[in-house]
Amino acid sequence: MTYVDTLGQQAKVASRQIAKLSTAAKNDLLNQVAKALVAESDYIFTENAKDMANASENGISKIMQDRLLLTEDRIAGIAEGVRQVADLQDPIGQVVRGYTNLDGLKIVQKRVPMGVIAMIFESRPNVSIDAFSLAFKTNNAIILRGGRDAINSNKALVTVARKALKNAGITADAVQFVEDTSHEVAEELMVATKYVDLLIPRGGARLIQTVKEKAKVPVIETGVGNCHIYVDKYANLDMATQIVINAKTQRPSVCNAAESLVVHADIVEEFLPNLEKAISKIQSVEFRADERALKLMEKAVPASPEDFATEFLDYIMSVKVVDSLDEAINWINTYTTSHSEAIVTQDISRAEQFQDDVDAAAVYVNASTRFTDGFVFGLGAEIGISTQKMHARGPMGLEALTSTKFYINGQGQIRE
């Protein structure tokens, strides 16, 4: 039996044991985990410091190091996220529909757990606890495989959760942690059809593509965000400037940060020079511009074709000038990763056309793409942002981690 087989078997057994946990029992456990995270924060910080030291030694960028870092505020935020999940309505057992058919059969469709969820993710250690809390709230066992960069932090966080489970008399195997960060083990998890009911990859384009190519278990694709801001010819340019600055600079290393700016030709001569000046007062951003934009920006560099398809996760932004709304929509649909896209305009009909025609999970009018988030959308913590169309799309909250089952009650009916 391989390492993944052992984890999978333990998770499968655990999933059956926790399947009938009551809402009260689940909420109590989650609140205990939240308390334990704060109480054991010194242990977590010690382990996180090891990851930070390794990151510095390995030349990982400051932006990516920020994703790794755990502070008192961030631990408090993670704990609060767990408490918020405890406060959310429990979807398990909810009736989706119920009716009596022509044969007199009483048919009820209810929400039920998936079973065993596996998650492969990169860098941000908070993901481990977010994923656990959502999986546990929906009576699912979860197998977590984080990246090498955050191995010590992830292990510490999962250790705290497992200890809380054990103290509550619940099997600690409800959350499994993959300590082997090799690609071989990750790929073995991708094909563990005997144990895994759903695999969720959360990370960069390379990870997502690998999972799409090699997975045999059901997958929900998440994460990659080549997000665009389109500044229309009818935009309020001051508003557009603030939206672009926020979407690009507030936290560039996350998937809902803007990576590409598309500007209508009618306002480009006024907008781009002013944007460049305004953003430079806050943060140095490298603009990689097409030929028309390049002439209007003092410090921009020429964009390569690849730049328009790149999720930079850095203070870098591609710039494209278009002559019409239709051209903007076609351009975005060519390069989008179907995550989050935005238009800035005062024209309602153009805004509606953009929202209808752009193919993305979240499409904004006059707002930053940075709002695509489970908490902001009122879903509680999210396990990821789905960029596909099957089963779940956009921020994935509790319902996305459930399946349904039909309960049919009869009185001796047979089919003629």
Swiss-Prot record:
Gene3D superfamilies noted in UniProt: Aldehyde Dehydrogenase, Chain A, domain 1, Aldehyde Dehydrogenase, Chain A, domain 2
Localization: Cytoplasm
Keyword annotations from UniProtKB, A to Z: Amino-acid biosynthesis, Cytoplasm, NADP, Oxidoreductase, Proline biosynthesis
MF-aspect GO terms: glutamate-5-semialdehyde dehydrogenase activity; NADP binding
Predominant location category: cytoplasm
Biological pathway: Amino-acid biosynthesis; L-proline biosynthesis; L-glutamate 5-semialdehyde from L-glutamate: step 2/2
SUPFAM superfamilies registered for this protein in UniProt: ALDH-like
Its EC number(s): 1.2.1.41
BP GO terms, sorted: L-proline biosynthetic process
Reactions catalysed, as given in the entry: L-glutamate 5-semialdehyde + phosphate + NADP(+) = L-glutamyl 5-phosphate + NADPH + H(+)
Stored Pfam families: Aldedh (PF00171)
Enzyme class label: oxidoreductase
Family annotation (CDD domains): ALDH_F18-19_ProA-GPR
GO cellular component labels: cytoplasm
PANTHER family (alphabetical): DELTA-1-PYRROLINE-5-CARBOXYLATE SYNTHASE, GLUTAMATE SEMIALDEHYDE DEHYDROGENASE
Role summary: Catalyzes the NADPH-dependent reduction of L-glutamate 5-phosphate into L-glutamate 5-semialdehyde and phosphate. The product spontaneously undergoes cyclization to form 1-pyrroline-5-carboxylate.
Name recorded for this polypeptide: Gamma-glutamyl phosphate reductase
Species in which this protein is naturally found: Streptococcus thermophilus
Organism placement in taxonomy: Bacteria, Bacillati, Bacillota, Bacilli, Lactobacillales
